[in-house]
Structure formats: C-alpha cells, structure tokens
C-alpha cells in the first residue's frame, strides 16, 4: 500500500510539472486534471493506511 502512495505521489508531481509550468502548452488543462486525480488517489491511499486497511491491494 505504501508503494502505491509513492506511485501516486510521483504521478502527481509529474502532472504538476507538466500542468503548472506551461511545458505541455495546449494539454495544460488535461495535465492539471490528471494532477488533481492522482493527488486525490494519494490522499485516499494515505487515509486507508492510517485507518489500518492494509488489504486494499485488490
């Protein structure tokens, strides 16, 4: 589960770089949406780990 947290964090950071720096140009809006989706996934993963639901791998 912690592995997924780091994966979501990495994907959120990559999406942030693409979306907020202007590198993506026309796709900046899409990158921002993806950033928020992965950020939400990261937060949900953290909540599950804190609550002790470690069997969420399925």
Curated annotation (Swiss-Prot):
One of its GO terms (cellular component) is plasma membrane. It is found in: Cell membrane. The chain crosses the membrane at residues 4-24, 30-50. It holds the Pfam family DUF1328. Keywords: Cell membrane, Membrane, Transmembrane, Transmembrane helix. It is a multi-pass membrane protein. The keyword RNA-binding does not apply. Its main location: membrane. Belongs to the UPF0391 family. HAMAP family: UPF0391. This is UPF0391 membrane protein VP0082. The lineage of its organism: Bacteria, Pseudomonadati, Pseudomonadota, Gammaproteobacteria, Vibrionales.
């Amino acid at each position: 589960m912690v592995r997924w947290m780091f994966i979501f964090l990495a994907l959120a950071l990559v999406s942030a770089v693409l979306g907020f720096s202007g590198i993506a140009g026309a796709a900046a809006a899409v990158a921002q949406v993806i950033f928020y989706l992965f950020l939400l996934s990261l937060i949900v993963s953290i909540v599950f780990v804190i609550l002790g639901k470690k069997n969420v791998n399925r």
